[in-house]
Amino acid sequence: MTLFSSISSMSSSMTSSKSSLASFGIGTSMGSNSIACSVGSGSCGSGSGSGSGGCGDLTGGAKSSGGSCGGKGGSHNHGHGHGPHGHGGKGSGGSCS
């Protein structure tokens, strides 16, 4: 019984940390892959960055250039990355929706 209660408390703490991580990634799609799309070179999710690869490869988010939102919008950019080095849709717009 003790093991079960510790597992359920750990699972609830993971859920709360996941939601805080999802809210930390500005303009990204919510999910386990989009931990923080602002990690990497360039500015992802602000719509004003000029670096290439605005979203970090480690999180599997969308790799974008020109500051387009990697996961939720940007022009022709739908970021659904898979795996540690997965690239989502490659977008090159400057618009964030």
UniProtKB/Swiss-Prot annotation:
User: What residue spans carry the region label Disordered?
Assistant: 1-23, 62-97
* InterPro entries (UniProt xref): HssA/B-related
Q: Where is the composition biased (Basic residues)?
A: 75-88
- Gly residues composition bias: which ranges? 62-74
Q: Where are the transmembrane segments?
A: none
One Gene Ontology biological process: sorocarp development
Query: What family does the entry list?
Result: Belongs to the hssA/B family.
Its recorded name reads HssA/B-like protein 32
Annotated organism of origin:
Dictyostelium discoideum
